[in-house]
């Protein structure tokens, strides 16, 4: 009898191990393995998260049985993959059931939470205020995406007749998953009543992705 070739023997052992592992998995109780809090999704951006289970009798099927996924996302009943591009911000809670192929079938249910967040966040650090000769303030920024972005920020004060005056301009590379605690702005202005507008635009040229965030004062500021 000829000795087994090493490659054939290795393939045989791998096959035996895989079959043994599958048998062990099938003999174990059905269980959802994915953590209850899913990775955040970015508004309007492509998203994918895979739900996983172990035990029970494969193949398994998945279904949302309570609550709802964020608009724009869907659950694949075969693979357990949640994918799509969400169209609404918020924190979403929903329950998912997995069913195996045993006879009778076994099921398990788990509630998940999924947050849909803005790619770019701009907030007042120091709200605009009248100074001795104009208006000044500051904002804080957050890039919540996984991309470094080209960021442009423009701050203007618009008076009662619609004339705009520049209060600030910034352009720089904004690192992924980072924040800038304060960016100041301000300038001397003629006497008048002004609404302050902040417009922030981020771009990822390689993906042709653009996001925008805005702020404005709720009431006019009167300079003297």
Task: Give the role of each language-model region.
Residues 28, 115-123, 219-224:
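Extracellular interdomain linker/stem segments of modular secreted and single-pass surface proteins
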Residues 51, 90-102:
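A short beta-strand micro-motif common to beta-rich folds, especially ectodomain repeats
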Residues 47-55, 96, 138-139, 184:
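Core beta-strand segments of extracellular beta-sandwich domains
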Residues 43, 54-58, 67, 145-147:
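Short glycine/proline-centered coil/turn motifs in the loop regions
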Residues 99-105, 203-206:
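Short, solvent-exposed loop/turn segments at the edges of extracellular beta-sandwich modules
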Residues 71-87, 137:
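Strand-loop-strand motifs at the edges of beta-sheets in extracellular beta-sandwich domains
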Residues 92, 192-198:
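A short tyrosine-centered beta-strand micro-motif
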Residues 104-116, 170:
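C-terminal edge beta-strand
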């Amino acid at each position: 009898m000829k000795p087994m070739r090493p490659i054939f023997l290795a393939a045989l052992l791998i096959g035996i191990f895989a079959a043994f592992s599958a048998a062990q998995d099938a003999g174990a109780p059905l269980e959802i393995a994915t953590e209850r809090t899913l990775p955040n999704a970015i508004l309007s951006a492509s998203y994918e998260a895979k739900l996983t289970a172990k035990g029970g009798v494969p193949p398994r099927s998945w279904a949302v049985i309570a609550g709802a996924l964020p608009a724009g996302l869907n659950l694949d009943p075969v693979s357990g993959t949640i994918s799509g591009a969400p169209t609404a911000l918020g924190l979403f809670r929903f329950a998912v059931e997995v069913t195996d192929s045993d006879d009778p079938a076994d099921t398990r249910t788990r509630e998940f939470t999924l947050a849909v967040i803005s790619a770019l966040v701009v907030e007042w650090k120091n709200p605009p205020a009248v100074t001795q000769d104009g208006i000044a303030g500051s904002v804080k920024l957050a890039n919540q995406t996984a991309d470094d972005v080209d960021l442009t920020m423009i701050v203007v004060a618009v008076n009662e007749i619609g004339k705009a005056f520049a209060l600030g301009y910034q352009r720089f590379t904004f690192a992924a998953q980072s924040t800038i605690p304060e960016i100041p702005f301000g300038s001397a202005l003629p006497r008048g009543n002004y609404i302050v507008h902040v417009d922030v635009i981020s771009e990822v040229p390689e993906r042709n992705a653009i996001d925008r965030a805005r702020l404005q004062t709720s009431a006019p500021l009167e300079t003297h």
